[in-house]
Each structure stands twice: as C-alpha cells, then as structure tokens.
A protein has these predicted regions:
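Conserved N-terminal catalytic core of the sugar/cofactor nucleotidyltransferase
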Residues: 2-14, 41-129, 133, 470, ...
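Glycine-rich N-terminal loop/short-helix segment of MobA-like nucleotidyltransferase
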Residues: 13-37, 53, 76
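Catalytic-core segments of class I nucleotidyltransferases/pyrophosphorylases
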Residues: 163-254, 258
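Glycine/small-residue-rich pyrophosphate-binding loop that anchors the diphosphate of NDP-sugar donors
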Residues: 182-185, 277, 405, 423
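Rossmann-like NAD(P)H-binding beta-loop-alpha module
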Residues: 143-174
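A short, conserved acidic/glycine-rich loop-to-beta-strand motif
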Residues: 134-144
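Glycine-rich hexapeptide-repeat left-handed beta-helix
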Residues: 3, 313-485
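Extended, small-residue-rich solenoid/repeat segments and analogous flexible loops
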Residues: 220-324, 332-337
Length: 485
C-alpha cells in the first residue's frame, strides 16, 4: 500500500536499492538478499518499502550472484530497473552504476540497502519529508543503538549538525564510542549527488568509494546536510550473518504475533509460534504451541490450530480444529477436524464438518461435507462424497507404475477397514464395501461389494505344527474346557 496519494506533488525521482554485496559471512551459495524473513526475501522488503513512496523509478544494483538476484526480481518486481556493479568497489561505485540507468535524472533520489528488511515505506516517507522541509542537499536516516559495532558513526559539529560519517573500520577510538549510527539510507538531490560522486576518492583502508564521503563533500561546499533520527532501531538493522538473520526473524515474528493478538487472536506460546507476514487470521483463532503458519495460509474465526502443526498455503474454515498436522496447498472446511498426525498434501479439500484423523494422508483428494477418514488411511487422487465413512487402513491405490488415476466414493458410502480401492474405480452413492476387500470394479448404488477369499478353519493345525509352544498349550487348555464333564 502506498504512503502517498496519486496527487502527491514532486514525486520521488528514484529509489536506488543496493544489492550487490557478497555477503561472505552468510557462508551461503545463495545471495544474501534472497534469504527469508517471515516468508519473504530480504530484497522483497526493500522493494516493498521503495514502492510505497511511489517513485518514478526503482533501480536495484546487483553484482555478486547477480543471476539469482535478477531471477528473483523478475518474479517479485519485474518493473524495476537493473544496474550492474561489475566490481565490488564500494557503495559510491554502486550508486554511480545506478545513476547510469537514470540519465538526465532530476529531483530527489532515495538510496537504501537491500539487507535492511524492517525499514518501512512510512519511514522512507518521513525521511523524504524531513529532507524537503529542511531543503537539504542530502538527508541521512540515523538511529541510536546499544552496540554500534560494524556501523558507520554519525559525526556532528558543535551545533549538532551532521558533519560527516566515518565507517567503523576507519574510526578512531573516540569515534567508536559514538552510538548514533548511519542506517545506509539517504535522500539526495540528484544533481548534487551526481556531481559529488565524481569527486570522491578511495582514501580508506578498503580502497573503496564510500557513499558516505558525499556528505562531507556536500558539507564542505556549504550545502545543508540533514538527518532524521528514528526511535525504532530495528528499521536500521542490517543482516550480515546467520546470527543476525535469526535475530531479525525473531523480532519480525514477535511483531507479527503482537499485531494478531491485538486483532483478537490467542497465541498460547509466542516463543514457539511462527507466522509469516502474508498469513491472514480472524478473531478468536487460537494458536497452540509449536504452530507454524506459512505462505498464504488463512484461518477463519474460531478455528484452533496446533499444537505442533505446520500449514503452508492452507485455508482453514471457521471453528475447524487442526492438531499435530502437516499441510500444504489444501482447504479445510468449517467445523472440520484434522489430526493428530495427519498429512494434507497439495490439492486436498475437506468439506465442512469432515474429519481426517490419525495417520491419514490425503493428496489431491476432494472430501465432501461430513465425510470421515478417522485413522490409518491413504486417500490419493480421491473424490469422496458427503457423509462417507472410510474405515481404518483403507488404501486408495492410485498409481499403477505409469499413471495416476482417480477413485470416486459416493455419498454416505461405507468403506470397511483394510480395504484397497484400485483406481480407476467408481463406487456409487449408498454402497458398502466389506472389510478387507480389494475393489477393482465399479460398485452400484446400494450394493455390497465383497472381494476376499472364503475363510477356512483347519482343525488341529496348531497341535500338529506348533507342538510344545505356548500357543499349543493354550489351545489344549481351551479344548479341555470345552469338553463336557
């Protein structure tokens, strides 16, 4: 959602997102920017924040593992422009690469980082407003943090105005005591930025072109440099290793859960409950310990999820109960009951009031209202009518080694325990399948299908074949009791 209206005067000329770094400390074959926070890539958060201020252009600067990053951008934001930083020569060089995609650009340019996922569009809008209000040439977003290690420090003069930024590795002992840090997010006047970038030089320990040096040049030229100090330090937190990634995930999840609890959702144990940013929950939902809701999962009012349940892209109806279940790309109807230890694979739809019970696996199965499969069954490529009862141990044999076929069970059918339905087969409404049957042909309405060998009892077999065993002795005792006195 945009933080500006379509009538906002002087729109942002461009937002530049720096996403070219190597991310060595992640020790990953994936680009750092593609690692996820609450179900979304770090880079997607940056693009969302940038989009919120309605810029004329969004430019993402790529470099390390650029093919991965470009492919991801093609999925989530095909409208963005791509600039390539061929060599890792610093943030100043990266911005120069971005401006190469924006010839004759005038107006305000926001520069931000791709690995600061909690930075919001509202904060970018506030930074832009501060920049325009102060009529500054450049405005930097800052925060006070308890441990500034690794961050650039904000230098201020005797009047409290920003005089420059020094990177941590280049700071002296006194400067390292400063707790106000550079977030890496700025608003620049495009003309001033373009000119200043031609003047900065690699005079630091890394022999890189620092974008931060632009502030000192602007200040030396007598142009105003502004700053917006924000209270929420998490909006300036970058991610460079797995520890920081874990910490950020925890903080984002904490905020997501707090949001939903304020909206009427009960979370019994927030420390073990994880909810993605894209999940939708209704009032009076209860999340029990060990619950993980991911992707586009939605849970309607009054439903109870957990404990120990993971749902990915699952729609849960009102007052449903889902216990110790793994599910993905499925629909659970209102008042339905699932679990414990159920497995819902993609394409499963359980109707209102239906039941999928203990150790039942369903895949591409449409299960009607009130139908039940209480335990120990496999329902693969199935169409099950309303009110049908699937007994324990029933297998829908859907695969012949070459192709998968569908089994149809009609409304209010009764399928006896330990039966195998060999697809393709259709069982009409109101039919019975005797326990232990292997069904290979269609069954008509009201028919009983029995497909099993006739039982034969062999008298005396245990005494002859298992002589001396406990079983034989038990049989002998039982026979003696049956003999007339």
């Amino acid at each position: 959602m945009s933080v500006y209206s379509d009538q906002t005067p002087n729109p942002v000329a461009a937002v530049v997102i720096l996403a070219a770094g190597e991310g060595k400390r992640m020790k990953s074959s994936r680009s750092k920017l593609l690692h996820e926070i609450a179900g979304h890539s770090m880079l997607s958060y940056a693009v969302t924040a940038a989009t919120a201020v309605q810029p004329e252009h969004i430019v993402v600067v790529v470099g390390h593992l650029r093919d991965q990053v470009e492919a991801h951008l093609a999925e989530i934001a095909p409208h963005v422009l791509i600039a390539v930083q061929e060599d890792q020569l610093g943030t100043g060089d990266a911005v120069q690469a971005a401006l190469g995609q924006l010839a004759d650009l005038n107006g305000d340019v926001i520069v931000t980082l791709g690995d600061v996922p909690m930075l919001s569009g509202e904060t970018l809008a506030a930074l832009l407003n501060e920049h325009r209000t102060q009529q500054a040439a450049v405005t930097v977003l800052t925060a006070q943090v308890p441990d500034p290690t690794g961050y650039g420090r904000i230098l201020r003069d005797a009047d409290g105005l920003v005089s420059g930024i020094v990177e941590h590795r280049d700071a002296d002992d006194a400067q390292r005591q400063i707790s106000e840090i550079n977030s890496g997010t700025y608003v620049f006047d495009a003309t001033i930025l373009r000119a200043a970038l031609t003047e900065i030089a690699p005079t630091n320990d890394q022999s890189e072109l620092y974008l931060t040096d632009v502030l000192a040049l602007v200040r030396q030229a007598g142009e105003p440099v502004g700053a917006l100090l924000i209270d929420d330090r998490w909006q300036t937190e970058g991610i460079n290793d797995r520890i920081q990634l874990s910490r950020m995930n925890t903080e984002v999840n904490r905020r997501i859960l707090q949001h939903w609890m304020r909206e009427g959702v009960s979370v019994v144990d927030p420390s073990t409950t994880w909810v993605h940013a894209s999940v939708d929950l209704a009032p009076d939902v209860v999340l029990l310990p060990g619950t993980s809701l991911e992707g586009a999962t939605s849970v309607a009012a009054g439903a109870q999820i957990g404990p120990d349940t993971t749902l990915i892209d699952v729609e849960v109806g009102e007052n449903a109960v889902v216990t110790r279940t793994q599910g993905s790309l499925s629909v659970i109807g209102a008042g339905a009951n699932v679990g414990p230890f159920a497995y819902l694979r993609p394409g499963t739809t359980l109707g209102a009031g239906g039941k999928i019970g203990t150790f039942v696996e369903a895949k591409n199965a449409r299960i009607g209202a009130g139908a039940k499969a209480p335990h120990l069954s496999y329902l693969g490529d199935a169409v099950i009518g309303a009110g049908a009862n699937i007994g324990a141990g029933v297998i829908f044999a859907n695969y012949d080694g070459v192709r998968k076929s569908t089994t149809t069970v009609g409304a209010y059918d009764f399928v006896g325990s330990n039966s195998v339905l060999v697809a393709p087969v259709e069982i009409a409404d109101g039919a019975y399948i005797a326990a232990g049957s292997t069904i290979t042909g269609n069954v008509g309405p009201g028919e009983l299908a029995v497909s099993r060998s006739r039982q034969r009892n062999v008298s005396g077999w245990v005494a002859r074949k298992r002589t001396g065993t406990k079983t034989a002795r038990a049989a002998e005792a039982a026979l003696e009791q049956k003999e007339p006195s």
